[in-house]
């Protein structure tokens, strides 16, 4: 009986402390909600880029979808660095 209890406790801790990270990132979830697909670097010819999923992944969606879905932009605090004016 004690062996079963010990195995059950070890199984519970191994499930709770697993190093696997589940779920999607917020940008990937946003892309899937807009019926998009995360692709590396470039979208197909018949797809429009509607956002970004990760660092080098873009959110692509086919432009001929019958039901129009608004594509809200995700605003971020990042701003491009100012370029010096050369004379």
From Swiss-Prot:
Induction: Down-regulated on the ocular surface following inflammation and bacterial and viral infection. Constitutively expressed in all regions of the ocular surface with predominant expression in the uppermost layers of the corneal epithelium and lower levels in basal layers (at protein level). Also detected in some keratocytes in the corneal stroma (at protein level). Expressed in all layers of the limbal epithelium with no expression found in limbal keratocytes (at protein level). Strongly expressed in the conjunctival epithelium with decreased expression in basal layers (at protein level). Also strongly expressed in tonsil tissue (at protein level). The keyword Ligase does not apply. The keyword Signal applies. GO terms for molecular function: CCR6 chemokine receptor binding; chemoattractant activity. Residues 1-22 form the signal peptide. Disulfide bonds join 31-59, 38-53, 43-60. It is found in: Secreted. Keywords: Antibiotic, Antimicrobial, Defensin, Disulfide bond, Secreted, Signal. GO terms for cellular component: extracellular space. GO terms for biological process: cell chemotaxis; defense response to bacterium. Has antibacterial activity. PANTHER family: BETA-DEFENSIN, BETA-DEFENSIN 109B-RELATED. Belongs to the beta-defensin family. This is Beta-defensin 109B. It comes from Homo sapiens (Human). The lineage of its organism: Eukaryota, Metazoa, Chordata, Craniata, Vertebrata.
